[in-house]
Amino acid sequence: MSVPPIQSGYPVAGTVVDDELGDPLPRKSEIKEFSEDSGPEDAYAGYGENPFADEAVAEHWRQVYQESQYECRHVFDPTLTWSEEEEKAIIRKLDWRVCLWACVMFFGLQVDRGNLVQAVSDNMLDDLGLNTNDYNYGNTVFLISFLFAELPSQLLSKKIGPDRWIPTQICLWSIVASSQFFISGNGSFLLTRALLGVLEGGFIPDLVLWLSYFYTSRELPIRLSYFWTTLSVTTILTSLLAFALLHMRGVLGYAGWRWLFLIEGLITLLVGIASFFLMPASAVQTKTWFRPNGWFSDREVAIVVNRVLRDDPSKGDMHNRQALTPRRLWQTLKDYDLWPLYILGLIIFIPQSPPTKYLTLIVKSLGFSTFNTNLLTIPSSVFHIITLLAITRLSEYFNERTLVAMIQAVWTLPCVIALEWWPGMIDNKWGTFALVTVLLSYPYCHAILVAWTSKNSNNVGTRSVSAALYNMSVQLGNIIANFIYRDDDKPYYRRGNRNLFIINLLAIVLFLLTKAYYIWRNKQKERVWNALSKEEQDHYIKNTRLQGSRRLDFRFAH
């Protein structure tokens, strides 16, 4: 049957229609709307709400899962019920088995991409005959390589499965990271930076995709906040480790920063090898020859799978070894309703990036020793963890993304103003340290935006690509940030800080415009939807071929 005519101004042109999965897709569970003052108690509860209660809808999705060869299709059960206590127990098990190891793998990423900051505190630049601009170029080469590897890595991960590709990535980049022990000048420095970028690119969206197999859309932001909390924990641990490793300067005639690269690279290699054994492909594939009992009982497996499907039925419209077609890729690229989130990713992290990368150089320029410099980076990392977890919890509690995420830009604005116009900058040793520490303690909203992008994608194929596109926009912003602090502008970086101030103001404006856009789009959809009769709405739900955010019965989160 065809979709009945929609007499409205709704922009049908450019909508996404997918003919690859057979029958038209029915309505998804995100239809339920939450008010502005919704709390956690209003969140989706798999033991209570069931979008498959309609037998026709359940049968349709059963056919979709069968046609896509979805790996969990044999445990799909529209009639399954479970208690709140059972679900909480399973979430705890998922946090211990899935989320914790995701954090360990992210630790491996951050160790090898972040230890350059500690290395330069040990006179690495002087040892190699490099200056500030060379350091910037190295960071830029890394980010450009990282940027261009994002989408190919995501496509490869979707083809062979993140459980295979992610451990391979970790092992490969750890070998390159260790090889930095042997760099001898600008050429080898840039080469290793490029290789690290190529091999690490796509890791984050790959891991987010894997996490989405186990968690619902309301649970994912908090797990991602744990994920990015690891970034700060890693900074603390590597600062302490650097304190020890940099004392190895002179051992066998080598500089301490060389030992830092070698030893931390080998640590990451161990994480990569372990990941081959600790990353199951899905909830139904935890039993292996080395883990014969698996992670879950048969009932727990059924609950894990069905709670995720009831939150988002489209999570089963592709299997976990299925490549994205060029058609699906193009559909995601032209989904203009996700562009506001990509623009936010491009801009909002720039004001924090230069101070973060230059933290050890700034602190050391204040007269602190190499070892005290690394220890003094710890306070901002500790506070960063607290504010990150707080802002993500706040977003979940109020079911508010835009205004809560905007707290990051509001936090950094007065700090950036002080960087530019405070007369005691650099000259006041402890005042400068306190200012930079407060700035870098900002509430990181990245977890909110990643989960926000995932939710507004509203489709597995779109979600896997949009995660990469969002992360690419963030990396592009980091590339821009690398050219804000320049060698001819130090030590006060007045020109650079003035640019950070302007960008910080722009970030606040973009947050407000993004919220206004999604409110407008939801009202537009609501107007068209309400113009349909009940029969037309039912017909649309069961027969439309529109997918993802293009559906009239989908509402954007904001």
In which residue ranges do the predicted regions lie?
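Structural signature of the two symmetry-related core transmembrane helices
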Residues: 164-178, 403-418
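Extracytoplasmic gate region of multi-pass secondary transporters
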Residues: 117-118, 324-392, 446, 450, ...
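Central cavity-lining transmembrane alpha-helices of secondary-active solute carriers
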Residues: 140-155, 378-390
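Extracytoplasmic
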Residues: 97-132, 148, 153, 238-242, ...
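Conserved MFS/SLC helix-loop-helix module at the cytosolic interface between two early adjacent transmembrane helices
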Residues: 148-187
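Helix-breaking motifs and short loop linkers at transmembrane-helix boundaries and internal kinks
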Residues: 112, 128-129, 152, 160-161, ...
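Cytosolic juxtamembrane N-terminal segment immediately preceding the first transmembrane helix
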Residues: 2-115, 126, 552
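Central mid-sequence intracellular linker of multi-pass
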Residues: 218-231, 250-329, 495, 500-538
